[in-house]
Amino acid sequence: MEYLAGNYDVIVVGAGHAGCEAALAAARMGGRTLLITLSLDNIAHMDCNPSLGGPAKGHLVREIDALGGQMGITADETSLQVRMLNTGKGPAVHALRIQSDKQAYHLHMRNAILGQENLVLHQALVERIKTEDGKVSGVVTRTGAFYAAPNVILTSGTYLRGRIIIGDAMYEGGPNGQQTAMNLSGALKELGLELGRFKTGTPPRIHRRSVDYTKFTVQPGDSVPWRYSFMPTQSMFWGRDVDKQIPCWLGYTTPETHQIIQDNIHRAPLYSGKIEGIGPRYCPSIEDKVVRFADRPTHQIFLEPEGWNSDELYVAGLSTSMPEEIQYDIIHSIPGLEKAELLRPGYAIEYDYVKPYQLSLSLEVRRIPGLFTAGQLNGTSGYEEAAAQGLLAGINAALRVQGKEPFIVRRSEGYLGVLIDDLVNKGVKEPYRLLTSRAEYRLILRQDNADLRLTPRGREVGLVKDERWAAFQKKKAAIAEINALWRGTTFSPLNEHLAEVLAGVHSAPVHGGISGEELMRRPEITINEIKQLIPQLAEYDEEALLEAGIEIKYAGYIEKQLAEIERFAKMEERMIPEEIVYDQIKGLSTEGRQRLKEVAPANMGQATRITGVTPADISVLLVYLEQKRRGGQIHAT
């Protein structure tokens, strides 16, 4: 028997990384928000690796923070170790990776939710989405509670018809022994949504006392306390000093390891037919790596701590769904793990996902106004991709409450824009992972300038509050002062200190007056050299110095990418009417017509990026729209 349990502006179903960001964003923008979770004890739980970031993923976390999201703040506060990756390459691919304390991360995020105004938290299992006149009207739980709301955000992760697989053992369930939502998939199908089936997996966890660390190579954190959040007051390491970071450890599998896997490959669910879902290309299981790369005698593994007070080590690189007894043999064949105690076996999990071509760029389901989906439910992998989608969905649900236009991030504005654009226009055939190679404008979309790109937009929608805005304005002013300082400082060729600094980095001597800006353009000159020559620069924040230096050193390349963005923007401005009937357009290819109907692109720029739509289809569409415009059947754009 149903009963009305409450009225809200926004309901978020699922309190993983997507759900937390969605609920916090909607509430912070003034929407009366309800967050429903299967378990209050698993909010923002890291079901797989205890880390955040890396290439593209770290960029996303900074973009989430720049917009006023929570993930970066929580990651910084609960960090175990920080490392800046790819420092030997250009700034476009520099990426922060933070090792997190799983339990502390969960507690910090839960406290943020419990302390948030306009946000109510409740434990329940949602079984149905209710609609009225084709629009969302609320959700119904297993106990019959009806929560009414015109906006519902589904962030159910890997919990839709979840099935755990360990060798021959298979059972219904969510990650780490949690319950799963078995009926919600059917309810979504009744609403007309097309679902698919994916799988992912996780490695075993072992006891830290059972490892012989002398057979591993230590991987310490950086001495610089890098952080995700642009807030200068953000604390790190749960209040500890930077020299208290916990290391990770590098090791390798052996030919013996690979032989054990090959001898038992017939028992691997991935190869025995027990797993039907498609797994992630960029995070293969160890059995998959052994089969696909049979010529390689070893593979890297990393032992990653799961918390300051946890005895568990996450064995990165050893994801597996092999039978439990075989997992013991695999682990004990690795040098240093001969006596390892297995605390949790690795497993695979299959789950349903919503095919994302059914969404608009706001993450609203096009056919069901008020219904949004975000996170792994949309066919992605990774905490960061999930959180970014949740943030966007939360913003757009709140804007819908306010009767405002959707918030769309373009590909040229952020990795968040690349992520959403790829999902909607290209679809997914395997769990989607964001990569720097997917972005056309990598030099523009650096992690260091995420705030310059997106914080003003977060301010416009009401998510960036006064304290963050003041910090942003201070950084912008500092960058302007730094630029003025080294542009206005000129050095004589007779300056002995200049000659010493240049000789120290094997830079050519100068034969005439030279400015600090001109010096900075030299590849071998870094901020450190400029600070030696212009002592006043020591007064400025390192982030502001870094940003100003990159903009000068790479000015030519940045200008070229900005010109490309401007040219492409003209295609984005050519709008496609919502009422267009693609079946009436002669000359479209069969696949192109089908994909255009499925995605319903809002503009020509989006149409060009749809998988299956050819350049010939674009030409036909442009001619058709121009004919209609000249005939007065559509408005000029």
Curated annotation (Swiss-Prot):
What cofactor does this one take?
Answer: FAD
Q: Among its keywords, does the record have Ribosomal protein?
A: no
Which residues make up the binding site for FAD? Answer: 14-19
The residues forming a coiled coil are none
One GO molecular function term of this record is: flavin adenine dinucleotide binding
Q: Per UniProt, which keywords does this protein have?
A: Cytoplasm, FAD, Flavoprotein, NAD, tRNA processing
SMART domains registered for this protein in UniProt: GIDA_assoc_3
Q: Name one GO biological process term.
A: tRNA wobble uridine modification
What compartments host this protein?
A: Cytoplasm
Q: Which residues form the signal peptide?
A: none
**InterPro entries assigned:** FAD/NAD-bd_sf, GIDA_C_N, MnmG, MnmG-rel, MnmG-rel_CS, MnmG_C, MnmG_C_subdom, MnmG_C_subdom_sf
* Cystine residue pairs: none
A Pfam entry, by short name: SAM_GIDA_C
The answer to keyword tRNA processing applying to this record is: yes
Q: Which GO terms describe its cellular component?
A: cytosol
Q: Which residues bind NAD(+)?
A: 279-293
Q: How does it assemble?
A: Homodimer. Heterotetramer of two MnmE and two MnmG subunits.
As for family, the record states:
Belongs to the MnmG family.
Q: What does the UniProt record say this protein does?
A: NAD-binding protein involved in the addition of a carboxymethylaminomethyl (cmnm) group at the wobble position (U34) of certain tRNAs, forming tRNA-cmnm(5)s(2)U34.
Q: Provide the protein name.
A: tRNA uridine 5-carboxymethylaminomethyl modification enzyme MnmG
- Gene transcribed to yield this protein: mnmG
